Amino acid sequence: MSAEKAKAYWQLMRMDRPIGSLLLLWPTVWALVIAAQGIPSWDVLIVFVLGVFLMRSAGCVINDFADRKVDGHVKRTKQRPLPSGKVTAKEAIGLFLVLAVSSFLLVLTMNPLTIQLSFAGLVLAFIYPFMKRYTHIPQLFLGLAFSWAIPMAWAAQTGELPVMVWFVFVINALWTIAYDTQYAMVDRDDDLKIGIKSTAILFGRHDKLIIGVLQLVTLAMLVGLGQFYQLGQSYYWTVLIAASLFVYQQHLIRHRERDLCFRAFLNNNYVGMVIAIGLLVAFW
């Protein structure tokens, strides 16, 4: 394999832009810490950290495969490996299969419940990229896909799925819809021209308000999470920091400028990180 081809594969997997992997990683860490009531098992932690990066890369590859005929018409994506011809569709499918199989081999080291849950996770990862052609709520499907690591991680750590798993699942799904709507605001004008659907288009002039409502509900549920587990003051400080980050994001998207909407999206990495830190400190 040439250096140029390897670089194209690297870019196709978004390894040069790890924001998506980080946004998937932090909620997985939340689940592991809560399930373990502290530091999770090292073998489980390693499997899920590796799995996050492998499955996020697989998701990016299948997403670009699904969008290969439209990405060339979008300013932000026209230089991606598939529309630019650096990687063929056949090569992309092959890479997706390698990444998906590698992820599954990791899951096979976990308990039977985790293995069973992984099949639904793979289905969600595969169908999400195609939803933007058929529904205005692909962000909901991304929320489900990005949250599925939560029950998987919980099951791997404890072997069971208590009700609070699904409470954390909903927290993350709502937050994901909010930040992916910010991301969709970047491409809204291009998406309207080529017929791609998104919540940014569906929400229209109410986009900022609905994002704000989703963020408020996320914060309220994070507070509820702390109350359920009787977490200390340190946790609530991190929720307050997350709230301030949401306020900053609202400031960034106020004029719906592409670059600032993208900055707001990127800022969500810090939201996930501070909540992970808060949970770790509280449960330690």
Swiss-Prot record:
Localization per Swiss-Prot or TrEMBL: Cell inner membrane
A Pfam short name: UbiA
InterPro entries to which the protein is assigned, alphabetical: HB_polyprenyltransferase-like (IPR006370), Prenyltransferase (IPR039653), UbiA_prenyltransferase (IPR000537), UbiA_sf (IPR044878)
Highest taxon in the source lineage: Bacteria
One GO location term (cellular component): plasma membrane
Transmembrane segments: 33-53, 93-113, 136-156, 159-179, 209-229, 235-252, 264-284
Function of the protein: Catalyzes the prenylation of para-hydroxybenzoate (PHB) with an all-trans polyprenyl group. Mediates the second step in the final reaction sequence of ubiquinone-8 (UQ-8) biosynthesis, which is the condensation of the polyisoprenoid side chain with PHB, generating the first membrane-bound Q intermediate 3-octaprenyl-4-hydroxybenzoate.
NCBIfam families, per database record: ubiA_proteo (TIGR01474)
Family from the record: Belongs to the UbiA prenyltransferase family.
Protein name: 4-hydroxybenzoate octaprenyltransferase
